[in-house]
């Protein structure tokens, strides 16, 4: 099942969890970038590739969740998994933050994709936000807002 995400990648800082929940483990200067450079890097991820799951993930190895091992500072070897990036688009770039959308196969770790994007841009990076907008035929755009439900309830006397 295909999934679509909107993500924000902060360049120049790498956290141990690849997201804002972690601690910064590395800082690097961010090279001068423009949208052409970023678009070329994003396009390089299109198609089939392999990705190593992050230590801070729910994936199990020998019956143990990786995040559980990571919290004990135990790092184990992880097998690369095949992923497919169907579409990836730059939405915005300012203040060393890349906003992008990605349509990908199940099992794709967007945090790892963000780290890999930063590496191809000759720096480090971690996600600062991630929002899944679509899964299969379900889209957040088709969802009903809670305020709409509350108004329906009030107007119907519930």
Place the predicted regions along the sequence by residue:
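Catalytic/RNA-binding core of pseudouridine synthases
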Residues: 1-158
